Amino acid sequence: TTVDDDPIEKYGSDVLNVFNWGEYIGEDVIANFEEEYGVKVNYSMFDSNEILYTKLLGGTSYDVIVPSDYMIERLMEEDMLQPLDYSYMTNLDDLDPGVVALRDEYDPDGVYSMPYFWGSVGLVYNKKNVDVNKLEELGWNILRDTEYADRIFMYDSERDSFMVALKALGYSMNTENMDEINEAYEWLCELHDTMHPAYVTDEVNDAMINNEKDIAVVYSGAAAYIISQNEDMGYYMPKEGTNVWTDSMVIPANAKNPKLANEFINFMLNYDEAMDSSIAVGYTSANKKVVETLSSEGELYDGNEAYSFDASNPKNEVFKHNDTLKKVLSDMWVRIKVR
């Protein structure tokens, strides 16, 4: 398609400012949008929700941002978002009901946010060395099974690690009960002392592809990539439940180009653009037709249990923001790692 309307007449602007995670979009998506709508996209990237929040607080104006669930909840509470204009949203039919249910937990009916990617946290394991029956029996506690000492990767994040410990103990990942949190701290200390885990972030991908360890705590998108590169790897979401999350597109309250922002959000839901992005990124698309295609026989994620994961376990939880707790867990996490 080519431009029929002058974007300045139609949207009041021919420039759109987008702030997204690094490497979190298909290679041609921005160029396609610019060409189709006759506009220029200024695209910049962040690597944590907290950096995004600091930028917004500092008054930087973006038109579309892509925070995670708990940060959207916080931005809503602080009146930092504007409602979406659903008259632009023509691509809603293929939104996955699973991601919509997640979204509704923090933004009922999607007044402010449109899901982009979603996923879970789980265990990538070497199927040759780890018995799946043992995984099912022990769940998260397999991370403290000394048979695998020196052979596990933990994700270097207090939030994800305390989630693992709290779930292993049968508690909510969002607990504010200090007795439960202290118990989780002891659980992680014992894991540190007996298992000697390596604490990693993105380098876990190549390490697991190269069979460096047997078990790793990872995000489902990273797991999907690892499995696509190494068929000996599997993905398991423990039955005690885990963190399920979504990153969604929202429009800040101070956005200068809200009409174009709504048009862009709808464009991102297109089958072709969602497909391009999901192939590039490896995370599960909010577009269920994209997920069906990529999971089907002979396709990129055929038989890949991390890409089309089952989010139906009622013990799964969405992370809730809690400033006080964040500081407590952060301090504890530092203490665990330097033991």
Model-flagged regions — what are they?
Residues 76-83, 107-111, 225-237, 299-302:
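Ligand-binding "clamshell"
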Residues 2-12, 54, 73-118, 132-141:
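Hinge/lid segment of periplasmic solute-binding proteins
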Residues 153-157, 161, 165, 173-238:
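Ligand-binding pocket segment of bilobal, Venus flytrap-like solute-binding proteins
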Residues 82-93, 113, 231-243, 252-255:
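Short beta-strand->loop
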Residues 2-74, 78:
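Early extracytoplasmic/lumenal segment of secretory-pathway proteins
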Residues 309-339:
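Conserved C-terminal helix/tail region of periplasmic/extracytoplasmic solute-binding proteins
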Residues 252-313:
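Mature extracytoplasmic/periplasmic domains
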Residues 141-156, 169:
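Short loop->beta-strand "edge-of-pocket" segments that line small-molecule binding or catalytic clefts
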